[in-house]
Structures are given as C-alpha cells and as structure tokens.
C-alpha cells in the first residue's frame, strides 16, 4: 500500500447537494426557501424587519457629536504632590515618565483634586481656574502650552 493508491471508504465522502436545479434533483422549485416572496428572491436590506417599523425609525433622534470637543487626560494636584519635590519643574516628559497620564496623543489638563503643599512650575496643555489658583497661592506657576 502506498499513498497514491489509497481510496476513501465508500459512503464516507458525501457529494454536495445542489439546490434549485430542477425537480429531478430533489431540491428544486423552492430550494428550501419556503414560499415565494421577497426573502426568497434575494437578501433583504440591513435593518429590514419584515415590514414592521424598524428600530432606527421607532427610536427618537437624540443629541449630536460636537466636532470641536477636545478630550483631555486629567492630572490631579494630589498626583503632583506625591511624585514631585519642592521647586521642581513639571513638564510633560516627566509626567509621562512617572506614568501620571498614559496616552501621549491626548492633551493633559491640570485639575484641583487633592491638596498641594509644594511650590512647583507646571507645564500642561490646559488647567482649571481652581488648580491655577491653588498652585499660584503657594508661589508656583502654571504655564499653559
């Protein structure tokens, strides 16, 4: 016995049944599609519910996406308190290095969460008014890029 002379066992390999190829073929006429109708002829479009009002028309329109919206990564005063020393300059590279924010693609916004007791010079893309006040009250400086 050699590989080129092997034959499959009779009945182990079934032939594919070709539907819709006449009555004599056994699966002619409706070809397993049921009665004649729209869904027999071809596919129905996406979202079609058989004539019932589809969900995207039943539900009301709501809201919009503001194309001018800027998504910021928050940076809290509490995080700066933990990771930086007195009189240190806090720039974006140091912030990324200490993993206080993760995505380099998004701008960083300083928020007044927590307490700050150190004088720092901070360079960020944006800052809240209360965060700027908290830093400047200690003699620090916030520079918005």
Swiss-Prot record:
PROSITE patterns with a match to the protein in the record: RIBOSOMAL_L15
One Pfam family named in its UniProt record: Ribosomal_L27A
Polar residues bias (residue ranges): 1-11
SUPFAM superfamilies: Ribosomal proteins L15p and L18e (SSF52080)
Keyword Ubl conjugation carried by entry: no
InterPro entries according to UniProt: Ribosomal_uL15, Ribosomal_uL15/eL18, Ribosomal_uL15/eL18_sf, Ribosomal_uL15_bac-type, Ribosomal_uL15_CS
One GO CC annotation: cytosolic large ribosomal subunit
Gene Ontology biological process terms, A to Z: translation
Alphabetical UniProt keywords: Ribonucleoprotein, Ribosomal protein, RNA-binding, rRNA-binding
Recorded GO MF terms: rRNA binding; structural constituent of ribosome
Region (Disordered): 1-48
Compositionally biased residues, Basic residues: 14-26
Task of the protein: Binds to the 23S rRNA.
NCBIfam families: rplO_bact (TIGR01071)
Family: Belongs to the universal ribosomal protein uL15 family.
Subunit relationships: Part of the 50S ribosomal subunit.
Protein name, per record: Large ribosomal subunit protein uL15
Native organism: Mycoplasmopsis pulmonis (strain UAB CTIP)
Originating gene: rplO
């Amino acid at each position: 016995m050699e590989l080129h002379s092997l034959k499959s066992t009779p009945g182990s390999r079934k032939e594919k049944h070709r539907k819709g190829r006449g009555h004599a073929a056994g699966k002619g006429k409706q070809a397993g599609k049921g009665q004649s109708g729209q869904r027999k002829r071809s596919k129905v479009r996406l979202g079609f519910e058989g004539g019932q009002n589809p969900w995207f028309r039943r539900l009301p329109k709501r809201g919009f996406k503001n194309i001018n919206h800027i998504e910021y990564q928050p940076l809290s005063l509490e995080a700066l308190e933990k990771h930086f020393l007195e009189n240190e300059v806090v720039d974006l590279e140091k912030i990324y290095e200490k993993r206080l924010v993760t995505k380099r693609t998004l701008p960083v916004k300083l928020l007044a969460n927590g307490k700050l007791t150190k004088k720092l010079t901070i360079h960020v893309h944006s800052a809240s008014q209360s965060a700027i006040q908290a830093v400047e009250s200690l003699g620090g400086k916030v520079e918005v890029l």
